[in-house]
């Protein structure tokens, strides 16, 4: 991802509806995991997820590949390690949790990253993974933020399972707004990562929050979430 895109992400993620609800989703997953331990946040970027981990009692290690992203994280008070998800600089079996939100789609050899996530987890440890869904939504936005692919359920579960993890759940997110996203990106000429009018931001946040209470997780969405464990 270009340095300018990373800077924009850091500027908007604290207030942007999409990032706020994604952090809420992470928090709900953390509450169901039980006793906190040592966690790795791959692709920490602006540090939003790292702060959620810390707030819930986890001891997070933030990892970034891009120098600009690592610098941004440090500027925001996050201790970050430079490293490659395909060759994690951590001991085998040393972690209780790995989060990788919007990471795998940037990596050509995503299967190597999946195997590394498995390697660094202890037996019984959990991986929480989020990726963009459905190549039908491919657009100039994906190209602008250096995506290699978008995933369907079978493709994502195959990569993670071959890496050695046991899948516990896979679900769609940002389902209700998928038609809006598809329409906008059809005519887009670049990244749609930008600030949002406060009134519109509040409305979009209300819509995506409503998904928590609706039976839509099996329907097509904009993002796929996956929870898995190391056997």
What are these regions (language model features)?
Residues 177-205:
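C-terminal helical/coil "lid" or tail adjacent to the Rossmann-like core of SAM-dependent
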Residues 165-175:
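Conserved S-adenosyl-L-methionine
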Residues 10-12, 127-149, 153-159, 184:
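Short, glycine-/aromatic-enriched active-site segment of Class I SAM-dependent methyltransferases
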Residues 1-93, 97-101, 111-114, 193-196, ...:
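Conserved N-terminal segment of class I S-adenosyl-L-methionine
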Residues 107-111, 131:
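A structural helix-start
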Residues 101-104, 130:
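Residues lining the SAM
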Residues 111-126:
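A short glycine-rich, Lys/Arg-flanked "PGG" loop and its adjoining helix->strand segment in the class I
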């Amino acid at each position: 991802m270009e340095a300018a895109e990373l800077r924009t992400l850091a500027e908007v993620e604290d207030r942007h509806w999409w990032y706020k609800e994604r952090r809420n989703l992470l928090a709900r997953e953390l509450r169901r995991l039980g006793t906190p331990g040592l966690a790795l946040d791959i692709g920490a970027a602006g540090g939003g997820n790292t702060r959620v981990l810390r707030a819930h009692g986890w001891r997070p290690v933030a990892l970034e590949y891009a120098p600009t992203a690592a610098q941004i994280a440090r500027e925001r008070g996050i201790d970050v390690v430079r490293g490659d998800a395909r060759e994690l600089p951590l001991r085998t079996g040393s972690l209780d949790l790995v989060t990788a939100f919007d990471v795998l789609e940037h990596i050509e050899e995503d299967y190597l990253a999946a195997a590394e996530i498995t390697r660094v987890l202890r037996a019984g440890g959990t991986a929480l993974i989020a990726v963009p869904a459905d190549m039908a939504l491919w657009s100039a936005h994906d190209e602008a933020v250096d995506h290699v692919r978008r995933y369907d359920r079978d493709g994502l579960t195959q990569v993670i399972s071959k890496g050695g993890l046991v899948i516990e759940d896979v679900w769609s997110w940002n389902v209700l707004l998928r038609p809006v996203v598809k329409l906008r990106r059809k005519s887009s000429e670049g990244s749609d990562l930008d600030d949002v009018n406060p009134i519109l931001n509040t409305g979009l946040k209300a819509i995506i929050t409503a998904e928590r209470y609706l039976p839509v997780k099996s329907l097509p969405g904009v993002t796929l979430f996956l929870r898995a464990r190391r056997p």
